[in-house]
């Protein structure tokens, strides 16, 4: 129950919860109190509009549907009509739900907001398109369309009587001339998106989202003076503000709805445990305020009545909570009378016998028990069966012993499989079926669309784990990234290249022969793929249980610079390219050839059939070829790939002395312990071949030939929550979920009752290989667990990469996923890794494939009980001392020159890096250009700060283009990174990484400011125990993070970074700041000192563009740990 005292002395009280849900959950998209009549309007995300009577216990007045394909984005009541805005249409309807008019335009594509200009018949409409539309509903035409600037849109529109105000998705508010919509001024309010804003007089208030690696809502209300377009002091809120509106009054009174996006500690994730509230206060005086809490889920709509008696708050679960400040509240001071439907006409009690205006049908009559004149006679209502036609003698009957056989007259029809005898009437001619086309096969039926489980769907980006209130997402399910209960290390898919490459990294790490090769290799070659895998594999042990996922940007760059192109071909082509490039590079570094099969290659001329030459070759990746094959098992395809070599092209025959194509055949001398099978996913007949084979071989329980390809198990997030929650009385029969989903229990269900005989798979789990005189014979022994043939070698399916599509017949492949077999003890269980979602599957579900959404790109078979003991090679310390100045100045490095000078274990070093902004089209599909940060300079000093361990500038490659050198913040200019003009020590990114990994391997402790930002851009993975980040140490609670320049000035009393940043200076002062931190903490003055610092901040705005104090970082110190635990006790 909400209770708060208002300025009239009354109390706000909870009036009623309004549920707009019927059979499905509908999000409340907008609410509006009618300013003309006593009505309350609700719009939903499914295109439905409902009106209620607030003064009559919120009984329903009318309800109608305005769109079947879009939600209701805006409600604008006028005197006679109610206007509703959907994605592509503005519809006018009477308050009783009768359609009057609708307006559509080619300019209306993704509409989001509308504003009725007071005193006129004009609407201004905007949305996610770059246009503003003026529409006159009296003239029923579009009077003006204003083209906005590039990347500018209008998702919120307001009017203050003088100017029009719009907000876009980039955090800007535009002040526009109401006559011609020209921009007068632009206010940069928030870094990412404006959630809500309002204007009254010359004041503007906003609330929104800032971008700090992850999107975070600003926990304050920003205020602007429109006379000077100047930002005033912001107003702090207890939680994250969602809506901010002016309440018209003599003073500037503000009403704010706030809410936290996280559940309260100790509570389950039900719909009502997101703390929220409404706060009303005077803008110039926070003392005169009223506040009350709300029990609700995520808030999606807000409004108050014209006389401020009612406040309504809607949420994403379809519930509207209404509050009032008095016992008899009204919607408006002077409302028009609402038109109600006429009451039903009751039958007259009596009327005159000569009254011709009355009808006898209006007189109700009782049901008579006596027979009526209209009753059918009894003899006409008896059940009579049709007499069977007498049997006729058949001329084409053959008798065998006691059986009689006759030709099926429906042999060429759809009923040929049904035991149906046609019924012929005497007057009809009996036509026997022709047998001319009896041998032809039936045309294949088109495959139906199938729903893809969310276990396999492409995961949304983790830039914002709270669903945006105003977004275009069609998936309203709240996803979670805490499903990694199997403790696998996951990786982030920041670009298209990472999306595909991460799946192969998981497979390579799971196969011990490949993992052993990778961990034994280290070199100084630029863009070495195996080195990048080595760096990732060494960091896996320290990242187990980290749900944030590892970054693999350096691996993506290495793949792009080794010839992998995403500009054409889509996911299938990219997957095949990356598989071949990575496996080829790993095999190149393997001197022993432990993952290669050995062959004798024979070339024979197709003209004279003469044998040309014989040579020994090796192959580490078998590519399937589908060209001349119509139907074959997977074992037969693998045999073909083993024995048929690559096309050698036309060469001169030694016997017939003519240019001729050579037929290549191979004899197997030795099979590799690991068979890596490339399914050749980018070939033309790939999808057609697999669909044809699956229709013959693939089965699952409950299916037949026409429906053999069934559905996959649904994920818990696909189940809808019951609106009654744990209080539901019909939990046993209710089809909805009650309370928190037990994800481990859901995974256990996927592993139960799976060994059914109806399963059949095209991909065998075990194959037996027999080698005799160079010929390999493969057999599927999946169903023979006791198979024991002395001459056969058993290979077990250990890993797979599958391409996942959208489930359509004309499939669109979206991304790959990884499937790994678990330990032999529980070998029936598989692990599905879909980006950062990790789940268990049983063997049948893992091997089940479907041509509409799931086909294999890589199959990895490993010899039974074969394992390689992994031994990691230590990175030599000599690699740190390797000198390679790429600049032409001949300058020697400032780095230490002897191993004795390198820091020891647990020794502190100061580290800082400077970045530049670049753009490239190598990492995304279809050549899409992306901008990112790249390291331009990195510096490290010893614990005293006097000796430089290294200070390197990084040379840029030719495949990137610099957008901005960020000289003001990095101190780097164009000449510093050019080999011909640089006066610095210039090296490669690979050399810098080797120096970093030598220090990590030696166990040093890195001290710096916002170190996680540096490690993210460098793409270096460091254990948390080796990191001391002063940006988290010198922070008060959840307050904003402070810059190194400000902390040094306030704590050390020194001034740095006046002209440009110097990474050596920053590294030294980070060490000094950490020493001072230990000194203050030992004296017990840390809390008071931090409170003092936060009271003297020069700029209260956390916007990075307006204050130099903010540091963008993606890591936060957990609340239950001490940030200094990883640091040594003394310096």
UniProtKB/Swiss-Prot annotation:
One Pfam assignment: RNase_T
Region of interest (Disordered), ranges: 1104-1131
UniProt record, GO biological process: nuclear-transcribed mRNA poly(A) tail shortening; reproductive process
A Gene Ontology molecular function term of the record: nucleic acid binding
Gene Ontology terms: cellular component: P-body; PAN complex
Biased amino acid composition, Polar residues: 1104-1115
Record-linked PANTHER family: DEADENYLATION COMPLEX CATALYTIC SUBUNIT PAN2 (PTHR15728), PAN2-PAN3 DEADENYLATION COMPLEX CATALYTIC SUBUNIT PAN2 (PTHR15728:SF0)
Protein name: PolyA-specific ribonuclease subunit panl-2
Designated gene of the protein: panl-2
